[in-house]
UniProtKB/Swiss-Prot annotation:
Belongs to the PdaD family. Its EC number is 4.1.1.19. The modification Pyruvic acid (Ser) is found at residue 43. GO terms for molecular function: arginine decarboxylase activity. The keyword Lyase applies. Binds 1 pyruvoyl group covalently per subunit. This is Probable pyruvoyl-dependent arginine decarboxylase. The keyword Lyase applies. It comes from the Bacteria. It catalyses: L-arginine + H(+) = agmatine + CO2. It comes from Chlorobaculum parvum (strain DSM 263 / NCIMB 8327) (Chlorobium vibrioforme subsp. thiosulfatophilum). It is an enzyme of class 4 (lyase). GO terms for biological process: arginine catabolic process.
Length: 181
């Protein structure tokens, strides 16, 4: 059986509960993908895959459906502990080529920092496969300019969720790229 996704949507969520597993379930509900049997996969954005809205993507899902996703997930039960989960995306200018999705799930990073890091990871992975010359020691903003000026990388972005832990509760954050037939 060969399955190459033709559509993708991005979603994120936060859940809080006294039980760890229940906090994850609530994060899935917040992201609107709780009815699926999620199978996490690695980080390739398929060629010619169309990005659709969450609302459109949900129309393709049925309860119990085996659903493939790239997921970043993080949890804490520590009060005031900052957590985040981010999926970075880098797309090539040539739609017949594949792009990259990256997962990042740190502690103590803001959503902005976590998102930029995940986006940088995806763009760097794509740049290395496309033969774009760059200095890995330069900061993300400078490398982003180099990547996009090369004409080989057309777009990069991220979807990120962050939250702080609360006393007596588990807090879970997720960010997902949901891949559809």
């Amino acid at each position: 059986m060969s399955f190459v996704p033709t559509k993708v949507f991005f979603t994120k969520g936060v859940g809080r509960h006294k039980e760890y597993l229940s906090s994850f379930e609530l994060a899935l509900r917040d992201a609107k993908i709780e009815k699926c049997n999620l199978v996490t996969v690695s980080s390739i954005f398929p060629p010619k895959c169309e990005r659709i809205s969450v609302e459109e993507g949900l129309k393709h899902l049925k309860p119990g459906q085996i659903t493939f996703a790239v997921m970043a997930r993080n949890s804490t039960n520590e009060n005031n502990r900052l957590i985040s989960a981010s999926v970075g995306v880098a797309l090539p200018a040539d739609e017949t080529q594949y792009g990259y999705l990256s997962e990042h799930h740190p502690y103590g990073e803001t959503a902005e920092h976590s998102g930029e890091y995940a986006e940088d990871l995806a763009a760097t992975m794509l740049a290395t496969t496309l033969g774009i010359e760059f200095d890995p020691n330069k900061d993300w903003d400078e490398r982003e300019g180099i990547y996009k000026m090369s004409g080989k990388i057309v777009n990069s972005f991220n979807i990120t969720e962050s939250a702080e832990g609360e006393t007596g509760l588990w807090t879970t954050v997720i960010s997902c790229a949901v891949l559809l037939p």
